[in-house]
Amino acid sequence: MQKPSLELKGSSFTLSVLHINDADLDGVARELDDKLAIAPQFFLGAPLVVNLSAISDPDYNLAGLKDLLISRQLVIVGITGAPSAIANQAKALGLALIKSGKQSQTQPQLPKTTKIVKQNIRSGQQIYAQNGDLIIIGAVGNGAEVIADGSIHIYGSLRGKAMAGANGDKNAVIIAQNIDAELVSIAGQYWLTENLQAHASIKSGCIRLDGDSLTVEALSL
């Protein structure tokens, strides 16, 4: 029997949600550029759902926002939380309207995996553990990036960038034997070098979220 030319099947994907909290596109552009500068390769071509629930202006410049994101090589999958006037703009621009809702209690969760890398991660390299944790047996050098949807464990020095909870997991942690990072991030909350310098006395530690703020605890590793 000949295989059909196409099939329509249901599926689910993890997408990042960009919350727009201010109608000022210039301000949005500045803050977005700051975030993109932190990890440009991670965000490049990233599919986004844009949440506009904080925008009440019916004449909001959605076309301008779309152009702003496209010019930075971000891909808008659709919008959510928009009032009807903005939703009509979205339809005219060919953007999908996505309904947000709570996941069913019975919906199966993706199995969590662990990616183990037994080598030093050098400048310019990026390691990503999708749908799971990342274990690095080695050092993460300056200019290197390690990213995980779950937690990150580094059995060595962390001098580059480490981004855990990349899909929004606020329970993710970053553990390293020697923390001297350019950036650490959990579920979008991040510290740069200057933030980490305030905790310079802690070398081996666990970085986690406490509410919406990062905190670091000393460990004996």
Swiss-Prot record:
Cite the SUPFAM superfamilies for this sequence.
Cell-division inhibitor MinC, C-terminal domain
Its keywords, alphabetically, are: Cell cycle, Cell division, Septation
Entry keyword Cell division: yes
An annotated GO BP: cell morphogenesis
Q: Which residues form a coiled coil?
A: none
| Pfam families in the record | MinC_C (PF03775), MinC_N (PF05209)
Q: Mind telling me which PANTHER family this protein's record contains? A: SEPTUM SITE-DETERMINING PROTEIN MINC
Note the subunit structure: Interacts with MinD and FtsZ.
Family membership noted in the UniProt record: Belongs to the MinC family.
Q: What does this protein do?
A: Cell division inhibitor that blocks the formation of polar Z ring septums. Rapidly oscillates between the poles of the cell to destabilize FtsZ filaments that have formed before they mature into polar Z rings. Prevents FtsZ polymerization.
Q: What is this protein called?
A: Probable septum site-determining protein MinC
**What species does this protein belong to?**
Shewanella loihica (strain ATCC BAA-1088 / PV-4)
Primary gene name: minC
